[in-house]
Each structure stands twice: as C-alpha cells, then as structure tokens.
C-alpha cells in the first residue's frame, strides 16, 4: 500500500495539536482526522479515534505493523515540513512589506 496524497489542515500555532491530516492510499482509500501532536519527545501522529468511556480512546483505523506506521508518519511529516516552510516564507514576505 502506497501513500499517494497527504492533505494537511493547519491548526492554531499554540497548543499541542499542530494539524489534522487526511492520507490517501493507492488513490483509492482515504483516512481522515489523523492528528499531528507535539509531545514531550517531539511530534507524533495520532490515528483517528473514538472515545469509549472514562477517558478511554480506541483507534478507528490504524496500521497493523510499525513499518507501515513509519511510512505513513514519514509521508505526513514530509508534507508538514513543506507546509511550515511555505508559511515561514509568507510571514517573511509580509514582514518585509510592512
């Protein structure tokens, strides 16, 4: 299975949740609501989940092995880095215009 598209919706700069992502596989299947979260050891992805009860969350969709998780995470972080670069360029252009 190959990641064929990553779409990122930026969330507010402050807070632990940095973005919400949709990932398309083989141009045939999409998983929405993957979150990019900043933890104590850096950024990580959280698969879409549903609250089950007293603070328990259960993944709705998730990779079955660590290799697949790494492929998904690498594709998401690569697109997130590109998006952050574009935002930085826009901020610099705006600041220079002022």
UniProtKB/Swiss-Prot annotation:
Transmembrane segments: none annotated. One of its GO terms (biological process) is division septum assembly. The keyword Lyase does not apply. The keyword Secreted does not apply. InterPro entries: SpoVG (IPR007170), SpoVG_sf (IPR036751). Keywords: Cell cycle, Cell division, Septation. Could be involved in septation. Belongs to the SpoVG family. This is Putative septation protein SpoVG. It comes from Alkaliphilus metalliredigens (strain QYMF).
